[in-house]
């Protein structure tokens, strides 16, 4: 049956999204007004993160994984760790022997 694996992937993505939304239930309506307000604010922030994750999961299944490797790096053999300013002598690091310490 053609397309069966794609359907399974989509169903699995939907199950993941369902679990994400179930993991962030609405806050309870008890407590002081300020406590309820803070709980709702935190819940909305978490809900926005869940929405973003759900969109990424669905986009990955529908459109395939995104290629976020925008920066082309040179081969690792050409990379080195050194101080580019360490090769030059700086006037700031010289000590004047005539200066007095107070």
From Swiss-Prot:
A cellular component annotation (GO) from this entry: host cell cytoplasm
A Pfam family assignment: REV
Post-translational modification note: Asymmetrically arginine dimethylated at one site by host PRMT6. Methylation impairs the RNA-binding activity and export of viral RNA from the nucleus to the cytoplasm.
Molecular function in Gene Ontology: DNA-binding transcription factor activity; RNA binding
Motif (Nuclear export signal and binding to XPO1): 71-82
Name recorded for this polypeptide: Protein Rev
Compositionally biased tracts (Basic residues): 33-47
Organism: Human immunodeficiency virus type 1 group O (isolate ANT70)
Function: Escorts unspliced or incompletely spliced viral pre-mRNAs (late transcripts) out of the nucleus of infected cells. These pre-mRNAs carry a recognition sequence called Rev responsive element (RRE) located in the env gene, that is not present in fully spliced viral mRNAs (early transcripts). This function is essential since most viral proteins are translated from unspliced or partially spliced pre-mRNAs which cannot exit the nucleus by the pathway used by fully processed cellular mRNAs. Rev itself is translated from a fully spliced mRNA that readily exits the nucleus.
Protein family according to the UniProt entry: Belongs to the HIV-1 REV protein family.
Location(s), subcellular: Host nucleus, Host nucleolus; Host cytoplasm
Keywords attached to this entry: AIDS, Host cytoplasm, Host nucleus, Host-virus interaction, Methylation, mRNA transport, Phosphoprotein, RNA-binding, Transport
Upper taxonomic lineage: Viruses, Riboviria, Pararnavirae, Artverviricota, Revtraviricetes
Other observations noted: HIV-1 lineages are divided in three main groups, M (for Major), O (for Outlier), and N (for New, or Non-M, Non-O). The vast majority of strains found worldwide belong to the group M. Group O seems to be endemic to and largely confined to Cameroon and neighboring countries in West Central Africa, where these viruses represent a small minority of HIV-1 strains. The group N is represented by a limited number of isolates from Cameroonian persons. The group M is further subdivided in 9 clades or subtypes (A to D, F to H, J and K).
Stretches for region Homomultimerization: 16-24
Record PTM Phosphoserine, positions in chain: 5, 90
Region of interest called Disordered, as start-end residue ranges on this chain: 22-47, 81-102
An example Gene Ontology biological process: viral process
Keyword Amino-acid biosynthesis: no
Coarse class of the protein's main subcellular location: host cell
InterPro entries attached to this UniProt entry: REV_protein
Domain remark text: The RNA-binding motif binds to the RRE, a 240 bp stem-and-loop structure present in incompletely spliced viral pre-mRNAs. This region also contains the NLS which mediates nuclear localization via KPNB1 binding and, when the N-terminal sequence is present, nucleolar targeting. These overlapping functions prevent Rev bound to RRE from undesirable return to the nucleus. When Rev binds the RRE, the NLS becomes masked while the NES remains accessible. The leucine-rich NES mediates binding to human XPO1.
Motif, Nuclear localization signal and RNA-binding (RRE): chain positions: 32-48
């Amino acid at each position: 049956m053609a397309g069966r694996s794609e359907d399974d992937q989509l169903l699995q993505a939907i199950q993941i999204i369902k679990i994400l939304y179930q993991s962030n239930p609405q806050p309870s309506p008890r407590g002081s007004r300020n406590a309820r307000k803070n709980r709702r604010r935190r819940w909305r922030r978490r809900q926005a993160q869940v929405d973003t994750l759900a969109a990424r999961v669905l986009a990955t299944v529908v459109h395939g994984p995104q290629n976020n490797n925008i920066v082309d790096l040179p081969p690792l053999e050409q990379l080195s760790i050194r101080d580019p300013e360490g090769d030059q002598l700086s006037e700031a690091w010289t000590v004047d022997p005539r200066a007095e310490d107070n």
